[in-house]
Amino acid sequence: MVEIAHFGVEAWLNKWEKSATYDISQSTIASLSMHDLLNLDGNNGEEFYEMLDKQQMNYGWIEGSPEFKEEVAKLYHHVDPENILQTNGATGANILALYALINPGDHVIAEYPSYQQLYDIPKSLGADVDYWHIHEEDDWYPRIDDLKALVKPNTKMICLNNANNPTGTYLSRFWGQPVYMHF
């Protein structure tokens, strides 16, 4: 049986986020009230509600909305909409990618500290995980030379969390170019 480590940040949020006076921990978008949702069309929600009221409630597209996939594909160069996988949040997307790509005995390099599931889920799948540490003196960037030393013949995946969680550091495309080109 696969054992996944206790997800520390989620446990902490479950305990404290609803009782906090000020919540500065969120990394998600602000939620909408029904009033906000109905007023998205700028017409007091009348047209939007009329359109919504006529919609058949069903399970939806199993592989994601074709229209949504078309729009997402336009954001990238040379990406076919058939290769877009729509998920409910990044957590689900991460789990799907890790379960699809990682096998026992694979080697994974994970930026650390980072989003816990990016190193604990590969471990739970039987992968050998090495941490690619970030450094305060380098503005919380990991070092490329450290990465080169971590790579093994069976390295299957390098996990980067961009923007980094917990530091918020954004790894620029320019910084990442040696990583993308070398590996």
Task: State the predicted function of each range.
Residues 75-78, 98-102:
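Glycine-rich helix-loop-beta junction characteristic of Rossmann-like nucleotide cofactor-binding loops
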Residues 80-84, 104-107, 154:
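Short acidic capping loops at alpha-helix termini that bridge into adjacent secondary structure
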Residues 100-122:
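Conserved PLP-anchoring active-site segment centered on the Schiff-base-forming lysine
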Residues 123-129:
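A short helix-loop-beta submotif of the ANL/AMP-binding
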Residues 136-183:
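Active-site phosphate-binding strand-loop segment of PLP-dependent enzymes
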